[in-house]
């Protein structure tokens, strides 16, 4: 069975070479206002322009940009840029809201920028914030320092209860799918602890004998601290792209870059990989193509560096299927005409949550997964490109214990239904052509 599983996870990447998404986020005119720096508070204003097309806001659903920055602390060494929490402002072509994501240490490591009113179409904004360089124990030179502002498009998943699994006869239920004791869908009503058992008012899932390594241990409870999706959160519209991953590699020290380099896989270029690296950095020749061959360690390294976090498998079902009133079995209401030929959007505007690259999630099916508390990435990694050991102790570590797979593809094995948990607790350390990564962040 394990051999078949490994083959399936590898072969599912073969139909994904056309997974290219039209991402339009542009960040330009980055300016550090050295003339107005505050040498007492060790802060300095920064401004930059942000543009993207296809923006929307309707009711409780809208898209946004997650923006974060790095500065060149010394030649070739880039560090996370920290912001004063109360310093943000924005102007633009439409009314906008700028929210800073504040970490427990008291500084912000990124910005969520979105429309303030309903509407659709391209948006252009000028964002302003104050860089607290003193928080990095850094003395800003009089002539300034190079900085990079980076970003990803994200979509808001509204708060509220939702269902996991589906009301269906056992013979048609997806493998290892969540259910209630009576066999119907289970309602996740709040962030409170969830009891796991085949009894009343509990969450359960059936796993064939001997396959707990893939489907989960059927144990619990799921703690109140485990992110469940009933509170609002933002999720990346698209998986990490090759352009975004190339930026990550380029701004890492040499040892960390080598550890997180995905281009050494023998079939990388043949399977659609376009990232190349040299002593000056890395370049993606097709930057909008989804980054594949990402292992769990690669994904959490990128998420930590970007100030984001992995998603739980409950958050995956909320983002993919929606609320009970708008629930979709396939995350877009129907199957596409042909695999890889059209973007599938969930009701929240999230693209290809099923039928594309496998989504890596934190599982409820192991003690290590259930220990996840959803702490945010701090914006930096260690010398192997991993989240620092002291910073995200709740995350499944580089060995992937506590992780799993959701989403799949109908291209080979028909594993694309949102409720399918065939590999919901499978802890794979490797990367291959069928694996990408998508991160989330709690609403500020």
Where are these regions (language model features)?
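Functional-site microenvironments in short loops/helix caps that host divalent-cation chemistry
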Residues: 284-398
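Short amphipathic, basic-aromatic surface patches that mediate peripheral association
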Residues: 49-59
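Structural beta-strand segments of beta-rich domains
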Residues: 42-46
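Extended acidic/polar, glycine-enriched regions
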Residues: 85-152
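Short coil-to-beta strand junction motifs in C2/discoidin
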Residues: 58-67
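Disulfide-stabilized, aromatic/cysteine-rich ligand-recognition loop
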Residues: 289-290, 344-345, 373-444
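Bacterial N-terminal signal peptides
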Residues: 7-16
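Active-site microenvironments of metalloenzymes and redox enzymes
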Residues: 91-118, 165-332, 365-366, 442
């Amino acid at each position: 069975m394990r051999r078949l599983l490994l083959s399936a996870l590898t072969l599912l990447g073969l139909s994904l070479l056309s997974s290219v998404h039209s991402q339009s986020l542009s960040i330009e005119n980055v300016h550090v206002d050295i003339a107005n720096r505050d040498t007492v508070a060790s802060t300095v204003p920064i401004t930059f322009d942000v543009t993207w097309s296809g923006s929307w806001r309707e009711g409780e659903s809208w898209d946004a940009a997650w923006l974060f920055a790095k500065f060149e602390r010394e030649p070739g060494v880039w560090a996370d840029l920290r912001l004063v929490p109360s310093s943000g402002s924005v102007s633009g072509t439409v009314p906008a809201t700028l929210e800073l994501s504040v970490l427990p240490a008291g500084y912000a490591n990124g910005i969520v920028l979105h429309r303030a009113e309903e509407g659709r179409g391209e948006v252009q904004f000028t964002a302003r914030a104050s860089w607290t360089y003193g928080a990095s124990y850094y003395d800003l030179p009089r002539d300034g320092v190079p900085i990079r502002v980076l970003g990803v498009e994200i979509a808001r998943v509204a708060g509220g209860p939702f269902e996991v699994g589906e009301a269906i006869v056992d013979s048609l239920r997806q493998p290892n799918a969540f259910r209630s004791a009576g066999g119907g869908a289970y309602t996740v009503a709040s962030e409170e602890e969830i009891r796991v058992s085949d009894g009343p008012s509990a969450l359960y899932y059936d796993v064939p004998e001997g396959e707990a390594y893939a489907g989960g241990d059927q144990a619990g409870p799921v703690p109140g601290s485990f992110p469940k999706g009933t509170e609002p959160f933002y999720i990346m519209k698209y998986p990490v792209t090759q352009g975004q991953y190339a930026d990550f590699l380029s701004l890492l020290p040499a040892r960390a870059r080598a550890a997180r380099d995905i281009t050494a896989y023998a079939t990388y270029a043949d399977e659609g990989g376009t990232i190349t690296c040299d002593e000056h950095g890395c370049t993606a020749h097709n930057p909008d193509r989804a980054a594949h061959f990402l292992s769990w360690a690669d994904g959490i390294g990128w998420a930590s560096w970007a100030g984001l976090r992995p998603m739980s498998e409950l958050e995956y079902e909320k983002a993919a299927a929606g609320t009970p009133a708008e629930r979709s079995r396939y995350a877009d209401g129907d199957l596409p005409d042909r695999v890889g030929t059209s973007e599938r959007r969930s009701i929240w505007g999230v693209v290809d949550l099923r039928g594309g690259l496998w989504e890596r999630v934190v599982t409820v099916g192991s003690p290590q997964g259930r220990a996840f508390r959803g702490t945010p990435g701090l914006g930096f990694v260690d010398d192997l490109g991993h989240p620092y050991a002291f910073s995200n102790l709740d995350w499944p570590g580089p060995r992937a214990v506590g992780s799993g797979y959701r989403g799949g593809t109908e291209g080979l094995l028909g594993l694309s239904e949102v409720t399918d948990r065939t590999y919901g607790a499978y802890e794979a350390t490797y990367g291959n052509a069928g694996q990408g990564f998508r991160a989330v962040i709690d609403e500020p």
